[in-house]
Amino acid sequence: GDFTIMKLTDKTKDILEWIICIVIAFVLALLVRYYIGTPTIVKMPSMYPTLKQDQRLILNRWCRTIKEMPSRGDIITFEAPTSDSYIFSKDFNPNDVAAKYSNEKTKALDKFIYNVLEVNKASYIKRVIALPGEHLQIKDGKVYINDVELQEDYLQPQITTSTENCPFYDLVVPENCVFVMGDNRPESTDSRRFGCIPLEKIESKVWIRFWPLNLFGKVN
């Protein structure tokens, strides 16, 4: 009868309201994750001892949203360059020192899945060493910016910066790019191998470490 129809209608309405609430919550979560910030886990040892494997971080993505230029010393995450583009020979074009990305998406849905949902997207976490227009040199295990030695207190005392099998060790950083390296230089694949990272490929700045709790605080 009419009562049964009304009951079904009310039930359907409740279900629809729940579905709408879930969809809205999902969209809001995506927006916050993409534009403002998101948690992540350190998976590789390339930033040791500053960041250790399995530590939990909060990434600041607002800097990407407002297209803020990172500062030297900032720890950032960025889309990993195409792996088959890494150069291991010293024969390279000195005027072409930006990292290569060959998996650019053209369709809107593919862009959404890759950039927003981050399906099959690899990211690296490294420290910004040199900025646009700066002359970077690595010699005798040390880093020089515009002929001035860079003081790197975040490195372990015995660590030096090798250029073995690394073509990118004497270059001028292009406009809208940064040169990045891991703090654990012997265990880091970074700009020495794949070149400078375009600003448009930077995803976030490391902001807070929230695990382990005894190390909770801002990351420098």
Where are these regions (language model features)?
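Aromatic-capped interface at the extracytoplasmic side
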Residues: 31-45
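Soluble "head" domains of membrane/secretory-pathway proteins
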Residues: 5-16, 35, 49-220
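Hydrophobic membrane-insertion alpha-helices, especially the h-region
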Residues: 17-35
